[in-house]
UniProtKB/Swiss-Prot annotation:
The keyword Transmembrane helix does not apply. InterPro entries: Conotoxin, Conotoxin_omega-typ_CS. This is Conotoxin Am6.3. Belongs to the conotoxin O1 superfamily. PROSITE patterns: OMEGA_CONOTOXIN. It comes from Conus amadis (Amadis cone). Its main location: secreted. It holds the Pfam family Conotoxin. GO terms for molecular function: ion channel inhibitor activity; toxin activity. It comes from the Eukaryota.
Length: 76
């Protein structure tokens, strides 16, 4: 009986902790679905379609837009 109560309390605590420490606590699922809908309308907005620069191209130190490695004036 004690073990069952402890397990229930642990599960409730971990569930509450997960929701409390989530990255997007405001408008959780509602905001997620609106972003997904926007990306379906405009595939260019998807983060998966991010364009990157080839080896030897000038790159941006702030956005780190190289395909391989870290940008330092030129892509490695």
């Amino acid at each position: 009986m004690k073990l069952t109560c402890m397990m229930i309390i642990a599960v409730l605590f971990l569930t509450a902790w997960t929701f409390a420490t989530a990255d997007d606590s405001g408008n959780g699922l509602e905001n997620l679905f609106s972003k997904a809908h926007h990306e379906m309308k405009n595939p260019e907005a998807s983060k998966l379609n991010k364009r990157c620069l080839a080896k030897g191209d000038f790159c941006n130190l702030i956005t780190q837009d190289c395909c391989d490695g870290i940008c330092f004036i030129f892509c490695p």
